[in-house]
Amino acid sequence: MSERNQRKVYTGRVVSDKMDKTITVLVETYKTHSLYGKRVKYSKKYKAHDEQNQAKLGDIVKIMETRPLSATKRFRLVEIVEEAVII
């Protein structure tokens, strides 16, 4: 049980939902520069497994690390935190 709690959990925005059962999530993190103290923004894209194809473009989602599902997928969708507003 403690093993499961050590998995990485990220919150990010869905930037692509064109693949079947797969979404691309953009995760932005901030790190403080060691010498100057300025906060620098880093971003990385992760492919995540979405079994029911429920996440849509622009949604804020939570993803969790899991076993390798394909050559590039290492995360799965946990929940949709906020749905995108389509205008």
Curated annotation (Swiss-Prot):
Which CDD domains does the record cross-reference, listed alphabetically? Answer: Ribosomal_uS17
GO biological process annotation, one example: translation
**GO CC, any one term:** cytosolic small ribosomal subunit
Q: Which GO terms describe its molecular function?
A: rRNA binding; structural constituent of ribosome
Family annotation (SUPFAM superfamilies): Nucleic acid-binding proteins (SSF50249)
- Database matches in InterPro entries: NA-bd_OB-fold, Ribosomal_uS17, Ribosomal_uS17_bact/chlr, Ribosomal_uS17_CS
Keywords, comma-separated and alphabetical: Ribonucleoprotein, Ribosomal protein, RNA-binding, rRNA-binding
Q: According to its UniProt entry, what is the function of this protein?
A: One of the primary rRNA binding proteins, it binds specifically to the 5'-end of 16S ribosomal RNA.
Q: Its family?
A: Belongs to the universal ribosomal protein uS17 family.
- What is the protein's quaternary organization? Part of the 30S ribosomal subunit.
Q: Which HAMAP family match?
A: Ribosomal_uS17_B
**What protein name is recorded for this chain?**
Small ribosomal subunit protein uS17
